[in-house]
UniProtKB/Swiss-Prot annotation:
Pathway: Isoprenoid biosynthesis; isopentenyl diphosphate biosynthesis via DXP pathway; isopentenyl diphosphate from 1-deoxy-D-xylulose 5-phosphate: step 4/6. PANTHER family: 2-C-METHYL-D-ERYTHRITOL 2,4-CYCLODIPHOSPHATE SYNTHASE, CHLOROPLASTIC. GO terms for molecular function: 2-C-methyl-D-erythritol 2,4-cyclodiphosphate synthase activity; metal ion binding. Homotrimer. Involved in the biosynthesis of isopentenyl diphosphate (IPP) and dimethylallyl diphosphate (DMAPP), two major building blocks of isoprenoid compounds. Catalyzes the conversion of 4-diphosphocytidyl-2-C-methyl-D-erythritol 2-phosphate (CDP-ME2P) to 2-C-methyl-D-erythritol 2,4-cyclodiphosphate (ME-CPP) with a corresponding release of cytidine 5-monophosphate (CMP). Keywords: Isoprene biosynthesis, Lyase, Metal-binding. It comes from Haemophilus influenzae (strain ATCC 51907 / DSM 11121 / KW20 / Rd). It catalyses: 4-CDP-2-C-methyl-D-erythritol 2-phosphate = 2-C-methyl-D-erythritol 2,4-cyclic diphosphate + CMP. This is 2-C-methyl-D-erythritol 2,4-cyclodiphosphate synthase.
Length: 158
């Protein structure tokens, strides 16, 4: 059996903290306003794999009202979500992530993001795609107020 999941996340800039995207610290003058580390890429991906396995979403599994997830490392959240997906008998077919940001530039960091995600999902790096685009200076991402991200995950029954 093959299952597809889709995830979306957005965070505004505004915190004096590192900017973490795809599990990688991206040099920038500000970080995200968020309960956890605010990693939009991993949050969207976590939602995608949870959705594909019919396990709800990131907010159900890791509620932002629970202080144990305050400033949580999103790689840990992704790994726990994937553990639950594996318990249901699924492995990764492939994942595809689109980061929507006017700034900062993502290209220099994409290979590192792919490697970390592949490690967390226990799959080959060729099963992980990360790309970035802008909104041509339109909307909140175009005004550099934050970043959005979409992700799709294909799960295969083991």
């Amino acid at each position: 059996m093959i299952r597809i999941g889709h995830g979306f996340d957005v965070h505004a800039f505004g915190e004096d903290r590192p900017l973490i995207i795809g599990g990688v610290e991206v040099p920038y003058h500000t970080g995200f306003i968020a309960h956890s580390d605010g990693d939009v890429a991993l949050h969207a991906l976590t939602d995608a794999i949870l959705g594909a396995a019919a396990l709800g979403d990131i907010g159900k599994l890791f509620p932002d009202t629970d202080m144990q997830y305050k400033n949580a490392d999103s790689r840990g959240l992704l790994r726990e979500a994937f553990r639950q997906v594996q318990e249901k008998g699924y492995k990764i077919g492939n994942v595809d992530i689109t980061i929507i940001a006017q700034a900062p530039k993502m290209r220099p960091h994409i290979d590192a993001m792919r490697a970390k995600i592949a490690e967390d999902l226990q799959c080959d790096i060729e099963q992980v795609n990360v790309k970035a685009t802008t909104t041509e200076k339109l909307g909140f991402t175009g005004r550099q107020e934050g970043i959005a991200c979409e992700a799709v995950a294909l799960l295969i029954r083991q």
